[in-house]
Amino acid sequence: MFRSHASGNKKQWSKRSSNGSTPAASASGSHAYRQQTLSSFFMGCGKKSAAASKNSTTIIDLESGDEGNRNITAPPRPRLIRNNSSSLFSQSQGSFGDDDPDAEFKKLVDVPRLNSYKKSSRSLSMTSSLHKTASASTTQKTYHFDEDETLREVTSVKSNSRQLSFTSTINIEDSSMKLSTDSERPAKRSKPSMEFQGLKLTVPKKIKPLLRKTVSNMDSMNHRSASSPVVLTMEQERVVNLIVKKRTNVFYTGSAGTGKSVILQTIIRQLSSLYGKESIAITASTGLAAVTIGGSTLHKWSGIGIGNKTIDQLVKKIQSQKDLLAAWRYTKVLIIDEISMVDGNLLDKLEQIARRIRKNDDPFGGIQLVLTGDFFQLPPVAKKDEHNVVKFCFESEMWKRCIQKTILLTKVFRQQDNKLIDILNAIRYGELTVDIAKTIRNLNRDIDYADGIAPTELYATRREVELSNVKKLQSLPGDLYEFKAVDNAPERYQAILDSSLMVEKVVALKEDAQVMMLKNKPDVELVNGSLGKVLFFVTESLVVKMKEIYKIVDDEVVMDMRLVSRVIGNPLLKESKEFRQDLNARPLARLERLKILINYAVKISPHKEKFPYVRWTVGKNKYIHELMVPERFPIDIPRENVGLERTQIPLMLCWALSIHKAQGQTIQRLKVDLRRIFEAGQVYVALSRAVTMDTLQVLNFDPGKIRTNERVKDFYKRLETLK
């Protein structure tokens, strides 16, 4: 379990292991159910329990005047611990109601057969299971080649012996069939055996417990599913077809916001289905970029380290390691993201190594190459110990020998502001006019936001970032909470863990701290990069109680909960003069509900962990409220039987970020300080994080610092576009 304790003015949590258990492993004892039928015994009850209704998600639209829409509840999110009833069968998918299970079973049997997908004229099919599956149902995506050579994607939902198939144009989430997710799985116990209604249930091996899911409360009417399929443009589809169907060695690029990441995700999914995940090497030039796409660094995958040895030495090193040798020989496709930061000399070495290791004189030893990135952004890092001059990848011999297609994407999605797009293109090519320079200077103005969330500041150096965040955090009143990560990593891999993750080892927060989300939440509108503000710190059980008392979370509720959180596990403080004065200062109409929560809070164990409750801004006057509990941040190390993982709350202070860490991010509110710019491409990377000029502030702009490499400009003039 996670244990909360206070020291002076700081509150911390740390992980305490008992019998090898993790936070998700703890669960309350189970209650026996009175079963009426055999089917309901195995399939669970049909009615929602009171506990389940507590976890329902509330949605509101602050702009709407319709009172009838203010209390809409979405399906409850099961909490995997603190459940007083057995979760072994109570949440099974496909369960029958207790009232008339035979009638429900007859409905299922009488359902007409579905033929909603086009039959394939070929025998070739590629299938891969999705991650969101439960024991009672399985979701799969299958790709078929039709007669017109078009790659079709079919999603199949299997439940025991029944199977439903949908084409990719059907929104599965809107259908009557409810797909199970990881959060709907019963909580697994690490005990070797248990009893339920007289049945002895045995577990043959220890099962890794599931991590707790967040207790959420959503106040937004525009709830969109993060799992809905992405529709590619014609330009993007042609890039995908060149790679997947025609097996072409491709480099594709484009300015910031042209959908390079969307194409990459699609390619990875389809190639993994076609060849199997083991045959696809997913790499990037940096640890942060590698984690984002679910891969590893190019240096780690290839096994050559920094690559400063001779080719003979590197080949010998690879041949001496069986796993490394197998990876080189059985890889069919090598994907490299952020290719602009890879030195061309390194690619030349890798190409020769590939041909020698695979004993194949084809380009790159017969491995298909998929390269992506933007050479107008951050360039390769020069190494002081190398005599060779750093060169761009497109200047390497490997590029001339291997790359068949170089494609420039032209459609911009991130910025819908045409004037901002013109400014970014001018900076990108280093062709500033007097009017554009004047427009950028006019962006040096303050911007007020109604929700109080300040714009994220970007700086060129890490020290500027640290000073800004520390200064703003110290200026806030109240207690400081420190959340220390639990790392699962051998000592020799600790540096990899630190450099590959945006989530910090120690996260220090206060009430009103401004934070950024570091995980995607598929069940709400939260995405990696969302901005929010910490409202208060509470336990999970107190959040459930709060939702019973208050239907929505407004400013008055925030004031109430900040008062309540002070007395969690501390009955003596409740009787103090200072607390009594603060309590009596609250409106009289709120005192009755406040006393209920206070009496509940003082009975909570002082050892129960408190977590930040955050208000996230997801649109104009639209918010999501979420209790941020620790989550896992895994890192895959190729060929290493090591599970690197950091467990930490998915937050970081975001008053300020470095330009380097911001690369690849979309930031809704941006304040850029260009005072210490030192590298070509930094200004472009910084400003291209913005979405619109209305939310962009630029300080210390100097046209003389806009530098573009002429070799990069010449290269981009020769790129092919797909219309």
From Swiss-Prot:
Q: Which Pfam families match?
A: PIF1
Per UniProt, what does mutating F42 to A/D do? Reduces the interaction with POL30
DNA-binding region per Swiss-Prot/TrEMBL record: 682-701
One GO location term (cellular component) = replication fork
Q: Where in the cell is it found?
A: Nucleus; Chromosome, Telomere
Q: Which InterPro entries match?
A: AAA+_ATPase, DNA_helicase_pif1-like_DEAD, P-loop_NTPase, PIF1_helicase, PIF1_RRM3_pfh1, Rrm3
DNA-binding as a keyword of this entry, yes or no, is: yes
| Domain remark from Swiss-Prot or TrEMBL | The N-terminal part (residues 1 to 249) is essential for function and confers locus specificity.
Q: What else is known?
A: Present with 656 molecules/cell in log phase SD medium.
Known partners and oligomeric status: Interacts with DEF1 and POL30.
Q: What does this protein do?
A: 5' to 3' DNA replicative helicase recruited to paused replisomes to promote fork progression throughout nonhistone protein-DNA complexes, naturally occurring impediments that are encountered in each S phase where replication forks pauses. Needed for normal fork progression through over 1000 discrete sites scattered throughout the genome, like rDNA, tRNA genes, centromeres, active replication origins, or transcriptional silencers. Required for timely replication of the telomere and subtelomeric DNA and for wild-type levels of telomeric silencing.
So what family is this one in? Belongs to the helicase family.
- Know the name of this protein? ATP-dependent DNA helicase RRM3
Lineage of the species this protein comes from: Eukaryota, Fungi, Dikarya, Ascomycota, Saccharomycotina
